Amino acid sequence: MKIDVLTLFPKMVEVPLHESIVGKAIEAGKLNVDVTDFRQYSTNKHGNVDDYPYGGGAGMLLTPQPIFDAMEHVKSQNNQSTGRVILVDPGGKQFNQTMAEDFAKEEHLTFICGHYEGYDERIKTLVDDEVSLGDFVITGGELAALTMIDATVRLLPDILGNKDSAVDDSFSTGLLEFPQYTRPEDFRGLKVPSILLSGNHGKIDEWRRTESLKKTLARRPDLLETAQLTPEDKQILRELQTPDL
């Protein structure tokens, strides 16, 4: 996979990308990342990339020229292609696991990271997706883009040590992940559930599914609306929602 990132703060992106899973993917030659400082493409004599909005208003907007020219550079380095272009924007669709799975199918992704008050609307003619990390405000798009990149790259083939890790993660099944334990069996009186020590994998799977449903119902009931639930799952949920008499 090839990923391009357009940003005003390349160091915010370059350093984290060479750590952990994403860094291993780069080292293994399964991922190639280029980071472009679009300020370098400003034709303004002062190198400005922002200006006041027409009609008034607080803050400054990113001007189209530097980003358009930076995208031309990306095209020149990638056989005249920018791949699938993602604008990191608080007004976009909220990022989720399904979107990460969709991105992981692409050969080339380009992320545009904003700053200041927002973008000149004409910049959006360059993009395929406008994506937000959530309903909160951060200073720029770099941290959000890094999160999306990490969530996407870990889904690529042969990136994780255990191929089942990505499948078992929270949200991959539409539910939150079940509780997990490791050694020791008893830590300061806090014991591992006996079912996990039984060796009965059928019962363990049942316990994990029930715990996953229980956690999702308590913390993210909205996920149950789109999760693929079996008749057994629905019965478990009915029992969980029935108060003890």
Curated annotation (Swiss-Prot):
Catalytic reaction(s) noted: guanosine(37) in tRNA + S-adenosyl-L-methionine = N(1)-methylguanosine(37) in tRNA + S-adenosyl-L-homocysteine + H(+)
Keywords from the named record: Cytoplasm, Methyltransferase, S-adenosyl-L-methionine, Transferase, tRNA processing
SUPFAM superfamilies: alpha/beta knot (SSF75217)
GO-annotated biological processes: tRNA N1-guanine methylation
Keyword Iron-sulfur found: no
Residues annotated for S-adenosyl-L-methionine binding in this entry: G114, L133, G134, D135, F136, V137, I138
Annotated InterPro entries: Alpha/beta_knot_MTases, tRNA_m1G_MeTrfase_C_sf, tRNA_m1G_MeTrfase_TrmD, tRNA_m1G_MTases_N, tRNA_MeTrfase_TRMD/TRM10
Chief localisation class: cytoplasm
Record keyword S-adenosyl-L-methionine present: yes
GO cellular component entries: cytosol
Location in the cell: Cytoplasm
EC numbers, comma separated: 2.1.1.228
Example of a GO MF term: tRNA (guanine(37)-N1)-methyltransferase activity
Family from the record: Belongs to the RNA methyltransferase TrmD family.
Protein role: Specifically methylates guanosine-37 in various tRNAs.
Subunit structure: Homodimer.
NCBIfam families, A to Z: PRK00026.1 (NF000648), trmD (TIGR00088)
Official protein name in the record: tRNA (guanine-N(1)-)-methyltransferase
Organism: Pediococcus pentosaceus (strain ATCC 25745 / CCUG 21536 / LMG 10740 / 183-1w)
Gene: trmD
